[in-house]
A protein has these predicted regions:
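Anion-binding and metal-coordination hotspots
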Residues: 2-332
């Protein structure tokens, strides 16, 4: 699981900074598979997000004659703290923003902390998980990774299952507007890779987005005399259904969630990782940082989790000693 730790930085002392977007190796693998899919369907490859188009181009406004800079599409503007530049701006709620760090922590079924990672607060849990998983999996060879809904996406499910593990995540509601004829009303046929609509017409794969979402479209003539046209199409001329390239992996994770093992293991989160965070925040200062900089806070978190493991061991030894003492007393 991941938790945010408030940074020792004033949120009003900040500047705007332009940074280059760098594609990680996991999204590059997805990008390669997307381009392979496009080549199979006779389409050109997508340009890589890492292609360097320079620091920006300039254009002249024809009306005013003003020279304007065109921002590079492969860069984005972020908010950086002048007090702690390593921290990231975390959007806590609708109106609350603060500089923070996000900690990724893994524990076993008994609540022992096994590993951790610390990142800027503006990094989502799903983005921080994959390198964290690759570092811990060779050490512990876990067969099941149980996480909250923030880790429930197709890319994570694909990567975890490729490493011979199960991803156990909770149910998440479908995103988007509620419609009468949603995606679940369309039957998918894996053998021919096509969807069938309630009117028994076929939707064929038409295109694929850079994110890996395949678009299935129906011919306009098939929608012309459809009795469900008004409810199904709304303001569109033909129906489109999307399916991710790794959606099969997500369905496997969903089936594992509904299995007896999944129903038994998932409730253990509240007594393991959630309890670990609760004890750390309420009793040992995990809610706020005392240092400035990623390295110092990383070292503090390592010491804190080590102390929590030692505390857990000490309590178990005391408990065992009391049981032994009571047993000897009853015998005497």
């Amino acid at each position: 699981d991941g938790t945010h730790i408030k940074a020792n930085a004033n949120k009003n002392k900040r500047i705007k900074k332009q940074v280059k977007i760098i594609t990680d190796k996991y999204h590059k693998e997805l990008e390669n598979e997307v381009n392979e899919f496009r080549e199979m369907n006779g389409r050109d490859k997508y340009p890589s997000d890492d292609d360097d188009f320079g620091d920006g181009n300039y254009t002249i406004d024809e009306k005013t004659g003003e020279v304007k800079e065109v921002k590079n599409k492969n860069s984005k503007e972020i908010t950086v703290s002048t007090v702690d530049p390593d921290a990231g701006l975390f959007v806590k709620g609708e109106h609350e923003r603060q500089f923070a760090y996000t900690a990724q922590v893994a524990c076993d079924k008994n609540g022992w902390a096994l590993g951790f990672d610390l990142n800027p607060g503006n990094m989502h849990d799903s983005a921080a998980f994959l390198p964290f998983f690759d570092r811990l999996q060779p050490m512990y060879h876990a067969s099941i990774w149980c996480a909250d809904a923030g880790y429930a996406n197709n890319l994570i499910a694909h990567h975890v299952q490729n490493n011979n593990c199960h991803l156990l995540v909770p149910y998440t509601r479908p995103k988007g507007a509620t419609t009468t004829f949603s995606k679940r009303e369309f039957d998918y046929y894996d053998e021919i890779d096509q969807y069938r609509c309630p009117n028994k017409k076929w939707l064929i794969p038409w295109n694929i987005s850079k994110d890996g979402n395949i678009e299935y479209k129906i011919h306009k003539t098939d929608c012309g005399d459809c009795p469900f046209k008004k409810e199904c199409l709304k303001n569109y001329s033909f129906k489109t259904v999307t399916r991710h390239l790794y959606e099969d992996c997500r369905l496997v994770a969903n089936d594992f969630r509904l299995s007896e093992i999944g129903k038994t293991i998932y409730p253990m989160r509240k007594t393991t990782i959630e309890r670990l965070f609760a004890v750390g925040k309420e009793q040992h200062g995990l809610r706020f940082t005392r240092f400035i900089g990623l390295e110092k806070n990383h070292n503090f978190l390592a010491l804190l989790l080590a102390c929590l493991n030692i505390k857990k061991l000490a309590l178990l030894l005391v408990k065992r000693e009391r049981k032994l003492k009571n047993k000897l007393t009853s015998i005497a």
